[in-house]
């Protein structure tokens, strides 16, 4: 059954193109210092070129990173790539307050992507053996979450209009030979800006939120000196 969260405001923040590490630290700080009344948030960001290793990551799946940095992350899953033209959406949801479980959230995120792609006439599906969203046998969206004190952070990475070559330098999500695809390969001309409003609308619909309210984002708001730092992002 779909959760109904009409009474729970959700805030949307547009971050633009950002390096991974400071945004990850900001997300950790937000989660660490949020309270029972803090509204849930969605962050939309494109990251500068980076490989991130999830908690289950193994070094043998990083084949030839070359000039792209590899950063350890505390999200679920294994290694993936982020770069310009890929829409990352971080979802900071108080699961306790929403009375939903992790599996429900994962399903909602996967359905968000499936419905977003359907809007652009792309058929896709989730797989029970490998989190994410796929078009036939090719992966188009990766997913990795972390739960702390009953609240989610991290989220999804949807390939839209990017250079897919760096995925050849890794075994994406720990699968040797995993083929990647993107929205623009299936529907030429579609951009990140085209996808963003559909993605946000579908996520709020999946969880029954009211319309997300766009508010400004400043990194300095999240990296205050009183906030603790973390070496694992």
UniProtKB/Swiss-Prot annotation:
Its EC number is 2.3.1.181. It is found in: Cytoplasm. The keyword Cytoplasm applies. Pfam families: LplA-B_cat. Pathway: Protein modification; protein lipoylation via endogenous pathway; protein N(6)-(lipoyl)lysine from octanoyl-[acyl-carrier-protein]: step 1/2. One of its GO terms (biological process) is protein modification process. Keywords: Acyltransferase, Cytoplasm, Transferase. Residues 36-211 form the BPL/LPL catalytic domain. InterPro entries: aa-tRNA-synth_II/BPL/LPL (IPR045864), BPL_LPL_catalytic (IPR004143), Octanoyltransferase (IPR000544), Octanoyltransferase_CS (IPR020605). Substrate binds at residues 75-82, 142-144, 155-157. The active site is at 173 (acyl-thioester intermediate). GO terms for molecular function: lipoyl(octanoyl) transferase activity. It catalyses: octanoyl-[ACP] + L-lysyl-[protein] = N(6)-octanoyl-L-lysyl-[protein] + holo-[ACP] + H(+). CDD domains: LipB. The record marks 139 as: Lowers pKa of active site Cys. The keyword Metal-binding does not apply. Catalyzes the transfer of endogenously produced octanoic acid from octanoyl-acyl-carrier-protein onto the lipoyl domains of lipoate-dependent enzymes. Lipoyl-ACP can also act as a substrate although octanoyl-ACP is likely to be the physiological substrate. In the reaction, the free carboxyl group of octanoic acid is attached via an amide linkage to the epsilon-amino group of a specific lysine residue of lipoyl domains of lipoate-dependent enzymes. Belongs to the LipB family. This is Octanoyltransferase. It comes from Yersinia pseudotuberculosis serotype O:3 (strain YPIII). The gene is lipB.
């Amino acid at each position: 059954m779909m959760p109904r969260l009409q009474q729970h405001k959700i805030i949307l923040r547009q971050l633009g193109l950002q390096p991974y590490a400071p945004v990850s630290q900001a997300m950790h700080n937000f989660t660490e210092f949020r309270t029972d009344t803090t509204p849930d948030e969605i962050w939309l960001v494109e990251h500068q070129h980076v490989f991130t290793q999830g908690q289950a990551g193994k070094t043998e799946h990083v084949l030839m990173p070359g000039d792209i940095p590899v950063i350890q992350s505390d999200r679920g899953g294994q290694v993936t790539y982020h770069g310009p033209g890929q829409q990352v959406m971080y979802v900071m949801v108080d699961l306790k307050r929403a009375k939903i479980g992790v599996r429900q959230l994962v399903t909602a995120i996967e359905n968000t992507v499936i419905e977003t792609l359907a809007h652009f006439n792309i058929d896709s599906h989730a797989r029970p053996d490998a989190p994410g969203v796929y078009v036939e046998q090719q992966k188009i969206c990766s997913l990795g979450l972390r739960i702390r004190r009953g609240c989610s952070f991290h989220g999804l990475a949807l390939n839209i209009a990017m250079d897919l070559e760096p995925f050849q330098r890794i075994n994406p999500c720990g699968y040797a030979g995993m083929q990647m695809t993107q929205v623009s390969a299936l529907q030429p001309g579609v951009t990140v800006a085209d996808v963003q409003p559909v993605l946000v609308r579908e996520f709020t619909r999946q969880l029954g939120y009211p319309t997300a309210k766009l508010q400004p984002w400043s990194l300095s708001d999240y990296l205050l000196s009183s906030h603790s730092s973390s070496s694992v992002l």
